[in-house]
UniProtKB/Swiss-Prot annotation:
Keyword rRNA-binding set for record: yes
Protein species of origin: Azorhizobium caulinodans (strain ATCC 43989 / DSM 5975 / JCM 20966 / LMG 6465 / NBRC 14845 / NCIMB 13405 / ORS 571)
Pfam family name, one: Ribosomal_L1
Family named by the database record: Belongs to the universal ribosomal protein uL1 family.
PANTHER family: 54S RIBOSOMAL PROTEIN L1, MITOCHONDRIAL, LARGE RIBOSOMAL SUBUNIT PROTEIN UL1M
Gene: rplA
Record's keyword terms, sorted: Repressor, Ribonucleoprotein, Ribosomal protein, RNA-binding, rRNA-binding, Translation regulation, tRNA-binding
Oligomer status and interactors: Part of the 50S ribosomal subunit.
SUPFAM superfamilies assigned: Ribosomal protein L1 (SSF56808)
InterPro entries per UniProt: Ribosom_uL1_bac-type, Ribosomal_uL1, Ribosomal_uL1-like, Ribosomal_uL1/biogenesis, Ribosomal_uL1_3-a/b-sand, Ribosomal_uL1_CS
Biological process terms in GO annotation: regulation of translation; translation
Function: Binds directly to 23S rRNA. The L1 stalk is quite mobile in the ribosome, and is involved in E site tRNA release. Protein L1 is also a translational repressor protein, it controls the translation of the L11 operon by binding to its mRNA.
CC terms in the record's Gene Ontology section: cytosolic large ribosomal subunit
Molecular-function annotations in GO: rRNA binding; structural constituent of ribosome; tRNA binding
Name of this chain's protein: Large ribosomal subunit protein uL1
């Protein structure tokens, strides 16, 4: 614990907690402090001017990161016949219908993204209480209920990141790894923020993107000047 505290103090040195850093400078500071023995995830946190308790202020969507997320994403697909074959050919890790339903009901959830063809949503709907709390329920708004199974699997494998505002009005997203070049991380962050801006709900009032911060798995949070990340 003492060693961990020393490492945290060292990581925080040289960071002004009150300063809003330009994105490039924030990433340079962050990458210099990623000293863990594994490839840390870089995360962005966005504070929005919304109250998600109101339906017209809910923010949800998906961002296709231009440089991928660096994660190995396991994809499950609910499909039958030709669409099941299409899913397998596209690289889906698990494909099925009633058999996949039974596997999940039995407590085995070995995937990070779930896709379904529209005709199987009545079947998938039975899993709402299992998949919903885990953020795995297929949803047409984020492209996971679709007949374009090939495209959905490719997007999931290639760096599509779903986002949903939390109760406090914050959105978190893993946008890459510490091993990514800083310019690739910056591109991913700007793409993610842009996707959140495009998902602005009709009920949002005042300043929509209020604060942005970046952090790593084991590193400090660094506040970012919103003008350096909001492209529109």
């Amino acid at each position: 614990m003492a060693h961990q505290g020393k490492r945290v103090r060292a990581a925080n040195e040289g960071i002004d907690r009150l300063k809003l850093y330009p994105l490039d400078e924030a990433l340079a500071l962050l990458k210099a402090r990623t000293t863990a023995k594994f490839d840390e995830t870089i995360e962005v946190a966005i504070n929005l001017g919304v109250d998600p308790r109101h339906a017209d202020q809910m923010v949800r969507g998906v961002c296709n990161l231009p440089n991928g997320s660096g994660r190995t994403v396991r994809v499950a697909v609910f499909a039958r016949g030709a669409k099941a074959d299409e899913a397998k050919a596209a690289g889906a890790d698990i494909v099925g219908a009633e058999d996949l339903l039974e596997t999940i009901q039995g407590g085995t959830i070995e995937f990070d993204r779930c896709i379904a063809t529209p005709d199987l949503m009545p079947l998938v709907g039975r899993l709402g209480k299992v998949l919903g709390p885990r953020g795995l329920m297929p949803n047409p708004k984020v492209g996971t209920v679709t007949m374009d199974v090939k495209g959905a699997v490719a997007a999931a494998k290639g760096g599509a990141v779903e986002f949903r505002v939390e109760k406090a009005g914050i959105i978190h997203g893993g946008i890459g790894k510490a091993s990514f070049p800083a310019d690739k991380l910056a591109e991913n962050i700007r793409a993610f923020v842009d996707a959140v801006v495009k998902a602005k709900p009709t009920g949002a009032k005042g300043t929509y993107v209020q604060r942005v911060a970046v952090s790593s798995t084991m590193g400090p949070g660094i506040k970012v000047d919103t003008a350096s990340v909001v492209t529109a």
